[in-house]
Amino acid sequence: MSAAGKIMAGRERVRVAVVQTPPVFLDLERSIDKACRKIAEAAAGGASLVVFSETWLAGYPYWDEGWNSDSHAWMDVRNRFFDNALLIPSAQSQRLCEAAAQSGVTVVIGCNELDARPGVHTLYNTMLTIGDDGRIVGKHRKLRPTFVESAFWGQGAGDDLYVHETAVGRVGGLICGEHVMTLARARMISQGEDFHIALYPGAFNVWSGPKMQVEDPDGSHFIGYASCRAHANEAGAFVVCAVGLIDEASIPADFPMRESLNISYARGGSMVIAPAGVPLVGPVYGDTIVYADCPARMIKLSKAIIDTNGHYGRPDVLSLRYHPEDRA
């Protein structure tokens, strides 16, 4: 059997790293500088898979753009947002590829992606995956921007829901609210993930308790954790949950919508979850790199009990259609 056909590409253990640090907000070039440094730092820490949070390049739109927004501030911010989006491929994305190759690591990073086809300048919320050889393995555009996100990003076409063979095994992923799109998760699970990457902009405050009346100030009841733990159990895979971090010091003093920012939930909270759905590391808060050692034996033991694509599946009763392949 080739390494490509083995769990975690035949490795007994993979160290993953979540880079939980603020980008240089709405500054693509300097954020790429920082990303390259952090990739090297994580690799020096023994990581083979390095993950950054949702739209880490070069910042999630944490500000409010209601109808009462100042039009001049809105135009200024939108120009910054547009001008600091990433083209794929480009000289900027090539720098990330070179950093991955130089450190010999697989990199997954969230970005604001600019679609620069002639006459098309839509932005997308994109997950970019780069192999340890510096090759772009794949990119996935978020299928459906959530709530007010629709004002910033277009809908992904959906033709990129694939799990990729990498040096650390089969890597798939989804972005934030896609984890409540049950069929999207089923699509990833059906392809056999070793690692599932889950990107979020922050650990949202929710209310807990039997009557949802207890405030959750530290985000420990963040609904993303429930989705990620369920996915780990169902997929028999490690889930790397990368949660965004930013603070007031990271926002430029001249940012026009500084007063309308909602960044209280962008405090980190990244975690790595074992195949049985139990947290392996985290949640961890603050500016740091979160490391976790992931042994292949955990996947093997999980699948010995529940193998969703094997003995625990009933394709004769239930099946999933992926429409882009129907149209191919």
Describe the role of every protein-language-model region.
Residues 1-49:
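N-terminal active-site segment of His-dependent metallophosphoesterases
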Residues 13-25, 126, 139, 169-178, ...:
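Active-site-proximal beta-strand elements of phosphoester/diester hydrolases
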Residues 28, 37-132, 202-230, 234-237:
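Cys-nucleophile CN-hydrolase/nitrilase-fold catalytic domain and related Cys-dependent amidase chemistry
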Residues 86-108, 170, 176-290:
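CN hydrolase (nitrilase-like) catalytic-core segments centered on the catalytic cysteine
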Residues 109-111, 125-129, 162, 270-272, ...:
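Short beta-strand scaffold segments in enzyme catalytic cores
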Residues 126, 139, 282-283, 291:
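Residue-level detector of high-confidence beta-strand sites
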Residues 142-156, 287-305:
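A short, polar/charged loop-to-alpha-helix boundary motif
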Residues 162-194, 198-200, 299-328:
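Cysteine/selenocysteine-centered motifs that mediate thiol-based redox chemistry or coordinate metal-sulfur cofactors
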